[in-house]
Amino acid sequence: MAKIEFVGIDEYLEKLNKIGDKTTGLCKRALYDGAAVLADAVRSEVQALPVTDRNTEPQQVLSYERDGLLAGLGIAKMKDDGGVVSTRVDFDGYNRLKSKTYPNGHPNSMIARAINSGTSKRKKNPFMSRAVAKAKAKAESAMSARMDADINEIMK
């Protein structure tokens, strides 16, 4: 009968256990890199929105709406829901147009949804869908590169 002898298997198993212990942290770092790529794509799409300073053209975005979206764009805190790590690129805060209904200003997330999906008075401009389509492959490769680099660092 043949005999096989492995050398260094204990060290290899120890490194694999280190990766297993740090999985959530590794995933969060990789996810953040992917979200950063997506946030950059969304920012460029928001900057490319057609802008006007008059409220008479329904398909146009008002300049203060775009400025509010750019100021409120960010990456949300990471959530760990039973081993599923997630985050989102979203719009936070308010723009400068105050009203009786919105004394702090209109919520940027509401403005983004209205621009993206359209309303009865505004033609839709799906900038988020375009940003996701443009950035998906780059975000996946950024996450993969981060994960590979972190795993290679542990496996040294």
Segments and roles (model prediction):
Residues I19, T23-L26, A30, G34, ...:
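Long amphipathic alpha-helical coiled-coil rod/stalk domains
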Residues S109-K156:
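Lipid-handling modules and contact-site tethers
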